Amino acid sequence: ATIVWKMEGGGYADCLMVCTVAAIISYIPIGIISAKIGRKKSILLGIILLGACFGVAGIFNAYHPIMNVFFAIIGFAWASIGVNSLPMVVEMCSAADVGKYTGYYYTFSMSAQVITPILSGFLLENVSYRTLFPYSVAFCVLAFITMSQVKHGDSKPAQKKSMLENFDVED
């Protein structure tokens, strides 16, 4: 941020704060939206938004307040992935295998969180600081391709009720 966007002090932390606050605000609405359109579509939408916003952010040569809009969208997009990923994993397995599949999910998720700073750090040091956003876009493309191949684990929409059943109340 200091080199590419000429930001001084702790101003670059504001970008992460905007993402985080947007994600926190988004968690419950995303859960509601995902129940209507499905987890897979919500995740794919999140990946598309992430990739698009990373691509746009990579174009800027200096920080501009409009970037906060993109960072807010990134927070929303990240939340749409996070809210739906583990439930999809759990939905794909039997009750006896929940622990095993949760272990797989966290092993790969945490491995990515360990490996990407090493890979991106190598690019930042040996190529350019401007590689961070293209690197992110590339992995969004890979995530989209991978997620588009998932066939199970989506939420099952509630069956439409007959007009009479809409007046029924639970005991």
Residue ranges and their predicted role:
Residues 135-169:
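Multi-pass alpha-helical transporter architecture, strongest
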Residues 1-11:
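Short amphipathic helix-loop junctions that connect adjacent transmembrane helices
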Residues 25-39, 124:
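Helix-to-loop junctions at the C-terminal end of transmembrane segments
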Residues 122-140:
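A membrane-interface helix-boundary motif in multi-pass transporters
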Residues 65-80:
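Hydrophobic core of transmembrane alpha-helices in multi-pass small-molecule transporters
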Residues 80-94:
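Intracellular juxtamembrane helix-capping segments at the cytosolic ends
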Residues 9-10, 93-105:
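Loop-to-transmembrane helix entry/capping segments in MFS-fold secondary transporters
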Residues 49-62:
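C-terminal ends and interior cores of transmembrane alpha-helices
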